[in-house]
């Protein structure tokens, strides 16, 4: 029997590479992880499993507003 060589090549993500190299510590990384967990918890899972559609709508509007204002703030900071 011959074994077939897999054509799939694993490439680690940037986050995995930073953890492996020991560069994942720091306040910015901690904030990034908290925001990512908050996003996945409240923006992705809750609207589909636990919330009524009216509550889900307002949660979506809240996160989109925060994102839009953050994006505007970054652009204003960079260009003005």
From Swiss-Prot:
Disruption phenotype: Lowers the level of total sphingolipids and increases the phosphorylation of YPK1 in the ORM1 and ORM2 double knockout background mutant. GO terms for molecular function: enzyme activator activity. It is a single-pass membrane protein. Keywords: Endoplasmic reticulum, Lipid metabolism, Membrane, Sphingolipid metabolism, Transmembrane, Transmembrane helix. It is found in: Endoplasmic reticulum membrane. The chain crosses the membrane at residues 54-74. GO terms for biological process: 3-keto-sphinganine metabolic process; intracellular sphingolipid homeostasis; positive regulation of sphingolipid biosynthetic process. One of its GO terms (cellular component) is endoplasmic reticulum. Signal peptide: none annotated. It comes from the Eukaryota. Interacts with the serine palmitoyltransferase complex LCB1-LCB2. Component of the SPOTS complex, at least composed of LCB1/2 (LCB1 and/or LCB2), ORM1/2 (ORM1 and/or ORM2), SAC1 and TSC3. This is Serine palmitoyltransferase-regulating protein TSC3. It comes from Saccharomyces cerevisiae (strain ATCC 204508 / S288c) (Baker's yeast).
């Amino acid at each position: 029997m011959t074994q077939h060589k897999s054509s799939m090549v694993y490439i680690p993500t940037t986050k995995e590479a930073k953890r492996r190299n020991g560069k994942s510590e720091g306040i910015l990384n901690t904030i990034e992880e908290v925001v990512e967990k908050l996003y996945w918890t409240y923006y992705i899972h809750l609207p589909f499993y636990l919330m009524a559609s009216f509550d889900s709508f307002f949660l979506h509007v809240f996160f989109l507003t925060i994102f839009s204002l953050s994006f505007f703030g970054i652009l204003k900071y960079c260009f003005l």
